[in-house]
Amino acid sequence: MLRKIAFGLAATAMMSSAQAQEVVLKVAHFLPPMSTMHSRFIVPWCDKIEAESKGRMKCQIYPAMQLGGTPPQLLSQVRDGVADIVWTISGYTPGRFPISEVFELPFMTTTHEASARAVWDFIDEHAASEFEGVKRIANWVVGPYVIHLRDKDLKTIEDFRGMKIRAPSRLGNRMLTALGATPVGMPVPQISESLSRGVIDAAIVPWEVVPATKAHELTKFHVEVSGGRSLTTATSIYVMNQKRYDSLPPELKKVIDDNSGREVSAWVAAEFKVGDEGGRAAALGRGNKITEIPADEVKRWKDASQPVVDEWIAEVTSKGHDGRKLYERAVELVEKHSRN
């Protein structure tokens, strides 16, 4: 009898152990598996949490919107539990991140890692409430945005006139308008078709997106700005459903916690830097022309886009915040981490 009881307890323990291993996190995003985010961060991150949980926690990754919907719906999908974790661009849901979008203002960010650390710290200080319902794993900005043009080069601010250019966000729209272009908003997956059909004359995206969108095959000219500041950028968020996180046992929560935060944000930003180098090389490999805008012309662009900054400060202030103080703090954090 005692042997039967012992056997039963052992079987129950084995069943409990097996059940404990069945934590499978659904991770969704909007780019194909060849993209930098998928291959250089999401897959390694998932491998890391699986190893650190000793196989008790794994990921099932759904790239290219395989769970359905469109990129702007990813944030709702993770909040509603359709996905457990998502990567998305905050600018795809205008108005939901009014404070943290400060980093998308013209000529705000510098290097990949420094900007990522600044974004994480700023959100900790001033914008954590924008992430209600989700657990932040990483916040960063993608690399410097480059203008990729179909048929003609762009060298001065006057060349923007009459051009239809894909913009990354509402602040990107405003910047392009200030420079004289006609902005066309769309998620990254729509860029290829829009370029090939002539819906847009150019697209603003970082270099790392180029291979996944075939932008180097659909354009002939690429424009970078000198001076170490990004023309504009997009704030990226890698977040987990809060209830799903709360349901984990303490030891698995610790695995997620150990793989979240400022330095994880810097890690993914560094991978985007590698991706940028690869995208730039792909364009050069096709014989495309890369133009760097000199400092005196960049100053003209910066002066022309200053009203975008002023308008953002006024908008945020009208909602009860100190817009000037928030802007200055974001600048301060970027400069602080750029010095380190």
Would you name each region that the model predicts?
Residues 4-14:
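Bacterial N-terminal signal peptides
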